[in-house]
Amino acid sequence: MKSIKVAAAVICDGDRILSCQRSYGEFKDGWEFPGGKLEPGETAEQAAVRELREELGVTIGSLEHLCTVEYDYDTFHLSMECFTCEIVAGTIEERVHENMAWLDVAHLWDVDWLPADVEVVKQLEQRLAGEGRARAFKDCAQVKSS
C-alpha cells in the first residue's frame, strides 16, 4: 500500500480552531486542518511552514508538535504530523479551499471531518477533558493581526 506523509497545523483564535474544506480530489468537500504533503528531503516542520504560506498566505513562527496520526484509507496509508503554530505575518486567505470556518470547542463536530482529521479532533477533545479549556489551549497559537 502506498504511504503518504503530510504535515498539518492546528491554528487557534482563543478557543476557536480553524477548519478548511477541501475543494478538489477524492476528498472534495471534506473538512481538514490546513497542511499538505512533504516534498522529498523536507521535514514535517518545513512542510507545515511551506504549506501554510502556499494555502493560507501566512508566515508561521515556532511549531509545537501536537500528535501523529497513522490512518489507512482504502488506497493508501497516511502518516500525518500535526502541530500547533503561531501566525507571525499575513492575513489568512482562502486560496485553495472551498471554505474555511472557525469552530469553537463546543462545535468541533459541526463539520464533516476527513477520517484522519477526526483523530486530531479526538486528541484535542482528550486534551480538553484532561486539562480543562485554559490549559488545553495554552500551547495553541493565537492568530496575530499584522
Specify the residue positions occupied by each region the protein language model found.
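Short connector loops at helix/strand junctions that flank enzyme active sites
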Residues: 4, 12, 28, 33, ...
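A short coil-to-beta-strand element that immediately follows conserved catalytic motifs
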Residues: 58-68
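Nudix hydrolase/Nudix homology domain
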Residues: 26-31, 93-146
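Conserved N-terminal beta-strand and adjoining loop/helix that marks the start
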Residues: 1-17
